[in-house]
Curated annotation (Swiss-Prot):
Keywords: 2Fe-2S, Aromatic hydrocarbons catabolism, Dioxygenase, Iron, Iron-sulfur, Metal-binding, NAD, Oxidoreductase. This is 2,4-dinitrotoluene dioxygenase system, large oxygenase component. Fe cation binds at H211, H216, D365. The gene is dntAc. [2Fe-2S] cluster binds at C84, H86, C104, H107. It comes from Burkholderia sp. (strain RASC). One of its GO terms (molecular function) is iron ion binding.
């Protein structure tokens, strides 16, 4: 066994400046991540718009576990492992639907939409009084919370409330998620399995604007809207047009200012800019010029660990781990509730064309995501990967922008924040230890010496 994974203590250096390459390909570490990352943190499940009525349900993933997310008769949302308590068979095969309950296809055990075991074939004849149905309901996800219609679940009772977990990321998201009038999620998600470690996808979304001009050069040259001047690394983004912000719990945000129409098809730009411009004027009076401008920008980001998005481009993703080298990407579209129906449809179509399974942006990115395969190689696995772009320039306590902030579009600020939190989790046995390790998180990330 290779170095017993170095006791999980030093895979990421202080301030997240370097990461051991093996974090992308080690089987033992992946199993440890399921325990310390996916069983501990808040994970995206679904959106109110996909389960609006009692009995509506969708399937979601929490790490490698599949769950049923169901709207209850009282309007609340509950989630349960999609596993029969009798012999462990998957209960629900459909991706979504409406049902009063769920019946296992193996022996016919029936559960209510509230997860309670309601019926057992030949219960009295075969079991007598031995079956304690109240004790044999589906295993429930103990914590469900919502952020402006976006529903998250968590298995850990010690985790902070969702709004605290999001931290300063919520400040950047609320102009679009709340003050715009709200969002709808367009599903079902398009799904594709990619040979890459889940973290590679998460870090790409959390703050990697640096790759756009080179990786996506051919698309940009074909006239892909706002970012076309960057094609082939022809130029840097003008100063003052972008920023990044990272948080205590690893979530991060990148803002491409005024790029509301983002990476979508050029024919959407005039209509998107007109729609967003009119709303920006209204929002400026309600939430101030700074946050109204964020609304009319493209915001890329990752809610730690694996929920990613591009607002202004209509893209919303979950990167579900399968194993240390394989990830299933789920791609939804997000649209504003008050958009004209035709614009919603076209934006959702454009989001899938660009970043769905066969998307032209997605194809470029997936070529890079397989970099994790090198983590399986003996010499490569023990090398250090660097994430020091912009280190020493980040600030905490900016007068306009919360979080640890870089005033540059090209920075690895958010990589460092993501991996600082990642290391704190994998080397901690519970939330209390994580909090103790993270008490000086912003000081660590804003050091100007000791690279």
């Amino acid at each position: 066994m290779r170095q017993a994974i170095m006791s999980y203590q030093n895979l990421v250096s202080e301030a997240g400046l370097t990461q051991k390459h093996l974090i992308y390909g080690d089987k033992e570490l992946f199993q440890h991540e399921l325990k310390t990352i996916f069983a501990r943190n808040w994970l995206f499940l679904t959106h109110d718009s996909l389960i609006p009525s009692p009995g509506d349900y969708v399937k979601a993933k929490m790490g490698v576990d599949e769950v049923i997310v169901s709207r209850q008769n009282d309007g609340s949302v509950r989630a349960f492992l999609n596993v029969c308590r009798h012999r462990g068979k998957t209960i629900v095969d459909a991706e979504a639907g409406n049902a009063k309950g769920f019946v296992c296809g193996y022996h016919g055990w029936g559960y209510g939409s509230n997860g309670e075991l309601q019926s057992v074939p030949f219960e009295k004849e075969l079991y007598g009084d031995a079956i304690k149905k109240k004790c044999l309901g589906l295993k429930e996800v103990p914590r469900i919370e919502s952020f402006h219609g976006f529903i998250y679940g968590c298995f850990d009772a010690e985790a902070p409330p969702l709004i605290d977990y999001l931290g300063d990321v919520a400040w950047y998201l609320e102009p679009t998620f709340k003050h715009s009038g709200g969002l709808e999620l367009v599903g079902p998600p398009a799904k594709v399995v990619v040979k890459g470690n889940w973290k590679v996808f998460a870090e790409n979304f959390v703050g990697d604007i640096y790759h756009i001009g080179w990786t996506h050069a051919s698309i940009l040259r074909a006239g892909q809207a706002i970012f076309a001047p960057l094609a082939g690394n022809a130029m840097l983004p003008p100063e003052g047009t972008g920023l990044q912000a990272t948080t205590k719990y690893g979530s991060g945000i990148g803002v491409s200012l005024d790029a509301y129409s983002g990476v979508q098809s050029a024919d959407l730009v005039p209509e998107m800019m007109a729609f967003g411009g009119a709303k920006q004027e209204k929002l400026a009076k309600e939430i101030g010029d700074v946050r109204a401008r964020i609304y009319r920008s493209q915001v890329n980001g990752t809610v730690f660990p694996n929920n990613c998005f591009l607002t202004g481009a209509g893209v919303f993703k979950v990167f579900n781990p399968i194993d240390e080298n394989t990830t299933e990407a789920w791609t939804y579209a997000i649209v504003e509730k008050d958009m004209p129906e035709d614009l919603k449809r076209r934006l959702a179509d454009a989001a899938q064309r660009s970043t769905g399974p066969a998307g032209y942006w997605e194809s470029d990115d997936n070529d890079n995501m397989v970099l994790s395969q090198n983590a399986k190689k003996y010499q490569s696995s023990n090398s250090d990967l660097i994430a020091d772009l912009g280190f020493g320039k980040d600030v905490y306590g900016d007068e306009c922008y919360p979080g640890v902030v870089s005033k540059s579009a090209f920075s690895e600020t958010n990589h460092r924040g993501f991996y600082r939190a990642y290391q704190a989790h994998i080397s901690s046995s519970n939330w209390a230890e994580f909090e103790n390790t993270s008490r000086n998180w912003h000081t660590e990330l804003t050091k100007t010496t000791d690279r």
